[in-house]
Design a protein with these regions (language model features):
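Serine-esterase "nucleophile elbow" of acetyl-processing enzymes
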Residues: 1-57, 61-62
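Alpha-helical cap/lid subdomain in secreted, periplasmic
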Residues: 22-25, 44-213
Length: 213
């Protein structure tokens, strides 16, 4: 029996059930019941989550954070986590993960879909005063995805420098945005979750078996 840890925000919560099914009975999957949110929340959470599972021996960890970090949820309208901070916290998170196992997979942030362009004009979620600056949780599709690619590229370089495998979930979804991304512009449709689950399970199985992707 192999022990695998799955970490991530709502995207992980969406594909996790199918990943468990695809990995089969010879793999025990540990994962938080809660949304792992932004990267620093995950760094804080790892200790308590591991403790809640009885601090099991870990054969592999597959994780991703980033979508929460890219939201503009503060009154200044800036990205919640600047790139430099995102990289530093991911560096610390990688060290944390390496303390459990050297068999690690970090997954890239998936792209947003065309619905972002439709929802943005009326998506003033913080400032309700018409005279106040508009603050949105996301952005239009192109600038949102440009930020996603920028953060993915920097984090990929960081992970690869540490010998950590990278599961490129961005590329799985990119090119199929209408098919795979839902009407909220961020979360996958069922077909999107399914294709992500297959890719995650495939990469986990390859890493457990010691084969190259």
């Amino acid at each position: 029996m192999k022990n695998v840890v799955l970490i991530g925000a709502s995207i992980r919560l969406g594909y996790e059930k199918e990943v468990r099914e695809l990995l089969g009975d010879d793999v025990q999957v540990f994962s938080p019941k809660e949304n792992c949110r932004y990267t620093k929340f995950t760094l804080w959470g790892m200790f308590s989550w591991m403790e809640s599972w009885g601090s099991p021996h870990v054969d592999l960890i597959h994780w991703n954070t980033g979508i929460w970090d890219l939201h503009r949820c503060t009154a200044d309208g800036l990205l919640f986590t600047p790139l430099e901070e995102y990289l530093e916290v991911n560096r610390r998170l990688a060290i944390q993960m390496e303390s459990y196992t050297k068999n690690l997979i970090w997954a890239t942030i998936i792209p947003g879909g065309p619905a972002l362009d439709k929802k943005m004009p009326g998506n003033s979620l913080i400032n309700t005063d018409a005279s106040a600056p508009k603050v949105h949780l996301t952005d239009y599709m192109e600038p949102w995805n440009a930020d996603v690619r920028r953060y993915n590229a920097a984090a990929t370089e960081l992970m690869q420098s540490r010998g950590i495998r990278v599961n490129d979930l961005y590329s799985v979804i990119d090119g199929h945005l209408d098919e795979y991304i839902s009407e909220d512009g961020i979360h996958p449709r069922p077909a999107g979750y399914s294709v992500l689950a297959r890719k995650v399970a495939q990469e986990i199985r390859r890493a457990l078996d010691g084969t190259e992707s």
